[in-house]
Design a protein with these regions (language model features):
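Catalytic core of pol beta-like nucleotidyltransferases
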Residues: 1-53, 62-70, 77-166
């Protein structure tokens, strides 16, 4: 199987991404007995002119990660969101795919606790992204796009970690 490579384009569809975010937000907020406190559209699809892979990133704030029960996971599965099992610390990640054969992500939910450090890191990261979008675009352009999506995501994470540690 050939590894997926990130396909990046300049975001000139911010309004379309915002509409899709609003649709997903409505679904999330109306889930029965939802533990969700608030949501926020984050990442490059929320910023005009950002170089983006087109994945809509949504920050989902809950009282506690323990509030995300098996029942909530099943409800998210019914909306075609599937939990990504990675060694994430203090967050859960769910993805929605364009299809389940290629596993091309179209939406990613980043679920964090209301009073946790992760929430502040995401909010600070979004502010940095908005302020330094040209530098981030240059960084993305400079990456070797023969790398896999996983390697690409790791490089993006490294950029944010460097910026957050300053």
């Amino acid at each position: 199987m050939q590894k997926q490579k990130p396909l990046l384009t300049i975001n000139n569809k911010t309004e379309q991404y915002r509409i899709k975010f609003e649709e997903i937000n409505k679904i999330l907020i109306t889930l029965l007995d939802t533990p969700i406190i608030k949501t926020m559209h984050i990442g490059s699809t929320s910023i005009d002119g950002a170089l983006t892979s087109g994945i809509i990133d949504i920050l989902v704030v809950v009282k506690s990660l323990h509030a995300m029960t098996t029942l909530d996971e099943k409800r998210l599965n019914l909306q075609n969101f599937y939990r990504l099992h990675h060694p994430y610390q203090k967050k859960c990640v769910y993805a929605q795919f364009s299809n389940l054969q290629s596993l091309t992500e179209v939406v990613r939910l980043h679920i964090v606790e209301e009073d946790g450090k992760k929430l502040n890191q995401y909010l600070t990261g979004q502010s940095i992204l908005i302020e330094q979008i040209q530098a981030f675009n240059q960084y993305k352009k400079a990456l070797n796009h023969e790398i896999s999506v996983k390697e690409y995501e790791n490089k993006k994470s490294e950029w944010f970690k460097r910026k957050l540690s300053v």
